[in-house]
Regions:
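Non-catalytic signal-transmission and effector/linker regions of two-component phosphorelay proteins
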Residues: 1-12, 116-133
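STAS-typified acidic loop motif
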Residues: 2-35, 52-54
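Exposed boundary/loop context
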Residues: 8, 16, 55, 61, ...
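Compositionally biased, intrinsically disordered low-complexity segments
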Residues: 21, 69-70, 95-98, 115, ...
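Amphipathic alpha-helical interaction surfaces in cytosolic regulatory modules
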Residues: 25-102
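Short acidic-hydrophobic, aromatic-tinged amphipathic segments that line or gate anion-handling sites
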Residues: 102-107, 111
């Protein structure tokens, strides 16, 4: 299987930093993800949303990188949400309990709305993990 180079683009929407993940999430993705996280959180956003719409394969190291982002978000009390996961990866995030620590939404609008709603109400994770926050 050919791998796609990982890129991560950061943009701000309504006070929420959106990290768009492009390509495969594996060990090679760590520098791009670290750089994106630093850029996204440098100005203390209300929340961070991870977009998986254009991501590809996610291996166990990629899952570990997401866990690292969750740990950093929790340590800095930054709510975090995700959207755009395929059904397969959404199930993996639920089985591994990543979904307990970040809401997984269907689209960007839901993720942004939930992040803002969660941030307004002081929810450190931005949701209770059920995706309906």
């Amino acid at each position: 299987m050919a791998t796609r180079e990982a890129l991560a683009h950061v943009r701000l929407r309504d006070g929420v930093a959106v990290i768009e993940l492009v390509g495969d999430l594996n060990a090679a993705a760590e520098p791009a993800l670290d750089e994106a996280w630093t850029a996204a959180t440098s100005e203390r956003p209300d929340a961070v949303v991870l977009s998986f719409e254009n991501s590809g394969y996610i291996n166990s190291t990629g899952i570990a990188l997401v866990v690292g982002l969750l740990a950093s978000a929790r340590a800095h009390r930054i709510p975090i949400r995700a959207y755009g996961l395929s059904d397969h990866y959404r199930e993996i995030f639920e089985i591994t309990r990543l979904a307990d620590f970040m809401a997984i939404e269907d689209d960007e609008d839901q993720a942004i709305h939930g992040a803002i709603h969660g941030a307004i109400h002081g929810d450190a994770q931005g949701a209770g993990g059920d995706g309906n926050g």
